[in-house]
Design a protein with these regions (language model features):
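Cell wall/extracellular polymer interaction/catalysis modules
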Residues: 1-110
Length: 110
């Protein structure tokens, strides 16, 4: 995932998954530090559905990739469109079932 632009409230980025570019949005107050993190798909009690969970984020837990359209919809999670949330979850569940490791690389361009 690359962060492309930032203002006082939001950080916009792009995540490349299986050849597709997916728009991302983060709350500027809660961005994840640059690095490589493991991803697993687990049930979220808060959202009541299966969602990607980003692991090993320093000092944080429960960081998800989920749908949202405004930076206020996140307290540290990566936001994507509703359609992309469903596709990512389905694709990553299949990878997880085949024991393929899933990771996200976060890189700050700005």
């Amino acid at each position: 995932m690359r962060r492309i632009s930032r203002n006082e409230k939001a950080v916009r980025g792009s995540m490349r998954v299986n050849g597709r570019d997916i728009a991302t949005l983060e709350n500027a107050d809660y961005i994840i530090p640059d690095g490589t993190y493991p991803v697993s798909v687990t049930f979220s009690p808060r959202f009541k559905r299966m969602l990607p969970l980003i692991g090993n984020v320093p000092g944080r837990s429960g960081i998800r990739i989920h749908r949202g359209t405004k930076p206020e919809h996140s307290k540290g999670c990566i936001l994507v469109s509703a359609a992309m949330e469903q596709q990512l979850t389905a694709e990553w569940l299949a990878l997880q079932a085949s024991n393929e490791p899933i990771k996200i690389i976060i890189d700050n361009e700005n």
